[in-house]
């Protein structure tokens, strides 16, 4: 029987426990998953503080930490092309073949639907707390963010000094308002 491969694209800014739970639940529905690291070209911005490479390392380590079979996923950085009419073709060119698309983004869902793909909503996991926005906010406010991310994420964040990076980016954005 042919393997069913799905795709899930997210910015992963940062990787958190919700991402891991969604990946686990998605792997209950498909044999393999392509995990697209969205907006791969973006980094060192308040909304997108981490490089694609940092996000790949964070995600890989978190998946290993959660005993997710490395043979069940592919992690592919995906740059934005800002041209919706050909975006699906771009994604298809950059990834292994897939038949099921998991997305909570209405534009992504519409684009893949128009190209004939089966589109499913990913299973959301405690979206109120487990969002990149909430984790970045907690990091900036010196609140407990560590409980929302895998241990592997904490280790890499300390390695790249991510809290300091985020705070410096916030200072930079505030100073640019006055310009």
Regions found by a protein language model. Give the residues of each.
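Nucleotidyltransferase catalytic core that binds NTPs
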Residues: 1-179
């Amino acid at each position: 029987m042919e393997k069913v491969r799905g795709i899930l694209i997210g910015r992963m800014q940062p990787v958190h426990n919700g991402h891991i739970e969604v990946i686990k639940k998605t792997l209950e529905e498909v044999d393999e998953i392509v995990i697209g690291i969205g907006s791969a070209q973006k980094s060192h911005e308040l909304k997108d503080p981490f490089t694609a490479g940092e996000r790949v390392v964070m995600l890989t380590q978190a998946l290993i930490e959660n005993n997710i079979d490395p043979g069940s996923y592919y992690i592919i950085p995906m740059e934005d092309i800002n041209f919706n009419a050909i975006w699906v073709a771009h994604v298809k060119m950059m990834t292994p073949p897939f038949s099921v698309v998991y997305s909570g983004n209405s534009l992504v869902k519409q684009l893949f639907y128009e190209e004939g793909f089966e589109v499913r909503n990913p299973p959301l996991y405690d979206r109120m707390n487990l969002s990149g926005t909430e984790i970045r906010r907690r990091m900036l406010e010196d609140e407990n963010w560590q409980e929302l991310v895998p241990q592997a994420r904490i280790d890499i964040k300390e390695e790249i000094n991510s809290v300091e990076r985020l705070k410096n980016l916030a200072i930079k954005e505030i100073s640019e308002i006055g310009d």
